[in-house]
Swiss-Prot record:
Keywords per UniProt: 4Fe-4S, Chloroplast, Iron, Iron-sulfur, Membrane, Metal-binding, NAD, NADP, Plastid, Plastoquinone, Quinone, Repeat, Thylakoid, Translocase
Domain 4Fe-4S ferredoxin-type: 55-84, 95-124
Lineage: Eukaryota, Viridiplantae, Streptophyta, Embryophyta, Tracheophyta
Membrane topology: Peripheral membrane protein
Catalysed reaction, written as an equation: a plastoquinone + NADH + (n+1) H(+)(in) = a plastoquinol + NAD(+) + n H(+)(out); a plastoquinone + NADPH + (n+1) H(+)(in) = a plastoquinol + NADP(+) + n H(+)(out)
Underlying gene: ndhI
GO CC annotation terms, alphabetical: chloroplast thylakoid membrane
Pfam families given in the database record: Fer4_7
Protein name: NAD(P)H-quinone oxidoreductase subunit I, chloroplastic
Subunit-level organization: NDH is composed of at least 16 different subunits, 5 of which are encoded in the nucleus.
Species this protein is from: Angiopteris evecta (Mule's foot fern)
Top EC group: translocase
Length: 181
């Protein structure tokens, strides 16, 4: 008889503890209902990238001296530099320059080590296509400057995530670790 009463008491204590945990979760849910949404409605609102953002690479054909430093410092030897040697002036003349952004890891080494600064990083990050071969940019496509997010009339820009009510989110004050069962 005592075993049955002890079992019933243990069961009721576990049920009450489970109800408390469910109640704590519900309090957290209610606490978040008063906050502004944290998501950005992407196609209509765009986040302005920082100045150091590493987006698509911009290339200036006239500045390039075909030294191939960008190929040597690239961890995956990605830029393809085609050149021919002009015998009359004994200099390399650039014929073609291309980068495949389907393979590029956007490390920025090519931009950093370029001696003539013909490469630069833009703030363009929308590189999605249905065919991966469209991501192989030649010198003409690399030379086009993208439309700035601030100048795009179809979108609303968000300068950062500082529109949240409390700034950086912190844990719930009543949160406990779930180590005791």
């Amino acid at each position: 008889m005592f075993a049955m009463v002890n079992g019933l008491r243990s069961y009721s204590q576990q049920a009450i503890q489970a109800a408390r945990y469910i109640g704590q979760g519900f309090v957290v849910t209610l606490d978040h209902m008063n906050r502004l949404p944290m998501t950005i409605q992407y196609p209509y609102e765009k986040l302005i990238p920082s100045e150091r953002f590493r987006g698509r690479i911009h290339f200036e054909f006239d500045k390039c001296i075909a030294c191939e430093v960008c190929v040597r410092v690239c961890p995956i030897n990605l830029p393809v530099v085609d050149w021919e040697l002009k015998e009359s002036v004994r200099k390399k003349q650039l014929k073609n320059y291309s980068i495949d952004f389907a393979v590029c890891i956007f490390c920025g080494n090519c931009v950093e080590y370029c001696p003539t600064n013909c490469l630069s990083m833009t703030e363009e990050y929308e590189l999605s296509t249905y065919d991966r071969h469209e991501l192989n940019y030649d010198q003409i496509a690399l030379g086009r400057l993208p439309v700035s997010v601030v100048q795009d009339p179809t979108t609303q820009t968000v300068s950062g995530l500082n529109y949240l009510s409390k700034g950086v989110m912190e844990g719930h004050p009543d949160s406990r670790s779930v180590t005791n069962f």
